[in-house]
Amino acid sequence: MRRRRYLRDRAEAAAAAAAGGGEGLQRSRDWLYESYYCMSQQHPLIVFLLLIVMGACLALLAVFFALGLEVEDHVAFLITVPTALAIFFAIFILVCIESVFKKLLRVFSLVIWICLVAMGYLFMCFGGTVSAWDQVSFFLFIIFVVYTMLPFNMRDAIIASVLTSSSHTIVLSVYLSATPGAKEHLFWQILANVIIFICGNLAGAYHKHLMELALQQTYRDTCNCIKSRIKLEFEKRQQERLLLSLLPAHIAMEMKAEIIQRLQGPKAGQMENTNNFHNLYVKRHTNVSILYADIVGFTRLASDCSPGELVHMLNELFGKFDQIAKENECMRIKILGDCYYCVSGLPISLPNHAKNCVKMGLDMCEAIKKVRDATGVDINMRVGVHSGNVLCGVIGLQKWQYDVWSHDVTLANHMEAGGVPGRVHISSVTLEHLNGAYKVEEGDGEIRDPYLKQHLVKTYFVINPKGERRSPQHLFRPRHTLDGAKMRASVRMTRYLESWGAAKPFAHLHHRDSMTTENGKISTTDVPMGQHNFQNRTLRTKSQKKRFEEELNERMIQAIDGINAQKQWLKSEDIQRISLFFYNKNIEKEYRATALPAFKYYVTCACLIFLCIFIVQILVLPKTSILGFSFGAAFLSLIFILFVCFAGQLLQCSKKASASLLWLLKSSGIIANRPWPRISLTIVTTAIILTMAVFNMFFLSNSEETTLPTANASNANVSVPDNQTAILHARNLFFLPYFIYSCILGLISCSVFLRVNYELKMLIMMVALVGYNIILLHTHAHVLDAYSQVLFQRPGIWKDLKTMGSVSLSIFFITLLVLGRQSEYYCRLDFLWKNKFKKEREEIETMENLNRVLLENVLPAHVAEHFLARSLKNEELYHQSYDCVCVMFASIPDFKEFYTESDVNKEGLECLRLLNEIIADFDDLLSKPKFSGVEKIKTIGSTYMAATGLSAVPSQEHAQEPERQYMHIGTMVEFAYALVGKLDAINKHSFNDFKLRVGINHGPVIAGVIGAQKPQYDIWGNTVNVASRMDSTGVLDKIQVTEETSLILQTLGYTCTCRGIINVKGKGDLKTYFVNTEMSRSLSQSNLAS
């Protein structure tokens, strides 16, 4: 039913939203809060009220028969109580039907109120002589429950309570004023009744207001907790997608656990890691096939591309290759420029790994052929495949990239280098694994690649089964069109590749706060497949917002079900059903130690109730010295308690507060923040009020007690004059019922301490109830009995002071107990939601930080911000062109000789452990402030690639002073020599003699992020290619730079030595320079010293 109502409301809200903005969603939220308020507060309380009233009716019948009262004398009572019981039972049955209750909520409230008022008047009119104090306690009960237990709103509750109290006052005033002999003390009694009713109205309104505020806070906390839970799930999904887009699942979870542990910090009792080595996330896998593929002709094409075109082409091409890899059970490892390599057989071994790689190679050639035929652009694929064993995983601390290492990987790389465009070049080992699945022909790879010749590798070309092999002169047959002839090759490529619709990198990322705002968004959909205009994005944002609202509302409905009336009495995971204690002792301790700034207002309300008790007793009691002294002492005590509670605020308002009064300021803070002072003050305050309610009853004069007759008025031993005298004395004791009413107000004063320990309030009220019953039924029973017998010939239950007092006190005790328990339950529930929200918020922050760490481990910080920003640009490809970026390649050529695969070093694993230490130590340098501008790009085997100048805004590059504009090139040189120093330190500890070979170049580059499956930040351009050549043609322990770079370095104070002219592959003859080692090191030391 709730679900149907919710859907109907959602439909109405959607229509309203279309007509008037966000009204619909607000209406949906309003209904949700109404449902929450109805089922969590109103429903349980009205059920409890009906149970209390029905229990009271049964108790009244039981007491009636227990006292042996004559049925003939109390027919009205015996008709009224069972009839009321039947009516309330029928209402109770209907209320328990949730759909009926929600539909007839106001009707039930009105019927119960009318029935209670009618019962009050029936008890008043048909019980004998009507007195001014008649049914005050019953009408006080009606007033109090109208506020606290009946589902009226505040306005309706005030109206109903005022009508109840004013009707009682008016009826009695009119009736008794016309009754002979009842006018003597009528005014003071009616005035006392008014004060009691005013007190009941104020206490009820106070209780209702605070409970509604508490419930609203609980609702908000529930919403916040559920929102945070949805966001946490979203963050976890996003983090998993992000992590799995960077690393394979088998290694990702292990690294994730370590990152989370690092983010959360060391926990108590957890042993610190005493291992001197960094963790190595590398595993060995056997029987895999490795594919290397290079796009032939792409370098020439790239020189004609704009930055956007280059990044778009690479993303589309490699996106297509990723799709082909997935179809053929291959895992892409890395993209190196325009080179793509992948492995089949990871992480789970596959018997057909060789077939998968060969099939993928053929599909890649076929895809490029289609591009070539459609665009007329002269590009092709050169593919090499080899099978064997690999070590795979991640090394270093930053910019993780999943990679593979082994001699077989090196051989696969040379299979590609020794191949032919448009063909799949395989080794004899791969051929054996194919088991005749493909026809092959001689490859003669040793002719084209010295490495293959040196290692005597027999190679073959796979014949594509889809068609006969074409001769090289027919491989390129451009399709000329009128439009194509007018367009650049890069434009033709870009337009054609758009039709592939490759996914964009990090398209699933959204802003970290998107789910905690009012207009929050949540994305659980797959990554988009292509460009969308702004309107489409806006539409999708609205649908995401709608999905988020629907999910939040669905979970709120579940939460409302979870805190329904019956649920708090059933077994709960967090709260014990009887005591309401938390199962978790730490949470229980935290709850009890919670600060309570509102405590002073509880004391204030209790003091107001005490003031009402004082006014009532002053109005009706004889004016005695004991009365004055007792209330005077009580007033002074309560005023002092009030002053201590409010001292903090009073002294803060006063500019001339004395230093001697500072202890009061501290005391006020201690009371608000510590439980034991609050408990002590609660006990003292309630004890004073409860005691003063009956204190003066013990000081009635002897004459007032002894002159009362001990039997009814018809006693034969009492003369008529004596009887008249007794009746007159009895009328002078009209104040006796007001002691009972004061006791009831005293019990109500206990309930105003809403967030004080429930068991403490229960104990105080129980002690008070027992004490009051001892007074009423034992110590002063003869006074009350005699007074009732003098006024009434056959007093019924509600006319007999002793019985009426005991029953009324018991009813109020049970009512206040239920309200106290209800209040305690929701206070604890609110605390629990806040506690869960706090923990989930911390977990969300950990997940957000984890996502940021993961993203910044792939991208530079400024690029990561681009993808984490609020804007919707993260659906577009990121690319940026720079005019001056310094690129460094630093390699350890000796590591190739050091790397061996044997049982001693666990088939090369221990060699990689050393490489991991080297790269990790290099990465440590990046955290130093002086190298904050250095951006690690990637590692390629034992080569470390980094760049500076990528953090500057391109438009601001030329705005800088010339010297400052090139400072980052000097930073790169300093970083290179810091790498040399790190490597020297590692050599000393590992007894090796590795030397670093460094190549540096500067100039324009294009930066971008490509690949949706494994997004990768990279830089491209001639500057990068030349820097790589500076390394590969360099000399050990030297930094080789181009002539242009050397001129810049010399202006920065570095000394460069000309090496001469060398031949650089693809670039011809270049004049290069070596940076002076000693000069650089001295500069580095001076910088560190400064």
Swiss-Prot record:
Species the sequence originates in: Mus musculus
Localization, UniProt: Membrane; Cell membrane; Cytoplasm
Disulphide linkage map: none
Stretches of the chain found on the membrane's Cytoplasmic side: 1-44, 207-600, 821-1090
Record: residues binding Mg(2+) 2: 294-295, 338
Known regulation of activity: Activated by forskolin. Is not activated by calmodulin. Inhibited by calcium ions, already at micromolar concentration. Activated by the G protein alpha subunit GNAS. Activated by the G protein beta and gamma subunit complex. Phosphorylation by RAF1 results in its activation. Phosphorylation by PKC activates the enzyme.
Subunit structure: Interacts with RAF1. Interacts with GNAS. Interacts with the G protein beta and gamma subunit complex.
Protein name: Adenylate cyclase type 2
Glycosylation sites: 712, 717, 723
Any Pfam family the entry gives: Guanylate_cyc
Listed EC numbers: 4.6.1.1
Post-translational modification summary for this protein: Phosphorylated by RAF1.
Cofactor(s) needed by this chain: Mg(2+); Mn(2+)
Protein family per UniProt: Belongs to the adenylyl cyclase class-4/guanylyl cyclase family.
GO MF terms held by the record: adenylate cyclase activity; adenylate cyclase binding; ATP binding; magnesium ion binding; manganese ion binding
Cofactor comment: Binds 2 magnesium ions per subunit. Is also active with manganese (in vitro).
Comment block on domains: The protein contains two modules with six transmembrane helices each; both are required for catalytic activity. Isolated N-terminal or C-terminal guanylate cyclase domains have no catalytic activity, but when they are brought together, enzyme activity is restored. The active site is at the interface of the two domains. Both contribute substrate-binding residues, but the catalytic metal ions are bound exclusively via the N-terminal guanylate cyclase domain.
Topology of this chain in the membrane: Multi-pass membrane protein
